């Protein structure tokens, strides 16, 4: 009773047929998870911020605080 010979032909093809669909599926799941778990909430947060953001009001507050060198506060 001897040991069975190992299959030496087609090893790469057999492993690729098994692992390639798994790799594509996992990469697709990871990409979709990143898109809907990270980028979409980030885009929504930016949109919510800029709905209420007033650039002129912010500029005037920084001008009055004396942050800018080229623009004097309105009191001077």
From Swiss-Prot:
UniProt GO cellular component terms: mitochondrial inner membrane
GO BP of this protein: oxidative phosphorylation
Pfam families with a match to the protein in the record: COX6C
Classification via SUPFAM superfamilies: Mitochondrial cytochrome c oxidase subunit VIc
Pathway: Energy metabolism; oxidative phosphorylation
Keywords assigned by UniProt, alphabetized: Membrane, Mitochondrion, Mitochondrion inner membrane, Transmembrane, Transmembrane helix
Localization: Mitochondrion inner membrane
Sequence intervals crossing the membrane: 11-51
Top-level lineage group: Eukaryota
Mitochondrial matrix membrane side: 2-10
Chief place of localization: mitochondrion
Membrane topology: Single-pass membrane protein
Residues in compartment: Mitochondrial intermembrane: 52-76
Subunit structure comment from the entry: Component of the cytochrome c oxidase (complex IV, CIV), a multisubunit enzyme composed of 14 subunits. The complex is composed of a catalytic core of 3 subunits MT-CO1, MT-CO2 and MT-CO3, encoded in the mitochondrial DNA, and 11 supernumerary subunits COX4I, COX5A, COX5B, COX6A, COX6B, COX6C, COX7A, COX7B, COX7C, COX8 and NDUFA4, which are encoded in the nuclear genome.
Family to which the UniProt record says this protein belongs: Belongs to the cytochrome c oxidase subunit 6c family.
Role description: Component of the cytochrome c oxidase, the last enzyme in the mitochondrial electron transport chain which drives oxidative phosphorylation. The respiratory chain contains 3 multisubunit complexes succinate dehydrogenase (complex II, CII), ubiquinol-cytochrome c oxidoreductase (cytochrome b-c1 complex, complex III, CIII) and cytochrome c oxidase (complex IV, CIV), that cooperate to transfer electrons derived from NADH and succinate to molecular oxygen, creating an electrochemical gradient over the inner membrane that drives transmembrane transport and the ATP synthase.
Name assigned to this protein: Cytochrome c oxidase subunit 6C-1
Species whose genome carries this gene: Thunnus obesus (Bigeye tuna)
Source organism phylogeny: Eukaryota, Metazoa, Chordata, Craniata, Vertebrata
């Amino acid at each position: 009773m001897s040991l069975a010979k190992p299959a030496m032909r087609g090893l790469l093809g057999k492993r690729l047929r098994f692992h390639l669909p798994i790799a594509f599926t996992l990469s697709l799941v990871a990409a979709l998870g990143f898109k809907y778990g990270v980028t979409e909430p980030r885009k929504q947060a930016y949109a919510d911020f800029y709905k209420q953001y007033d650039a002129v009001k912010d500029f005037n507050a920084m001008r009055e605080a004396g942050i800018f060198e080229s623009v004097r506060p309105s009191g001077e």
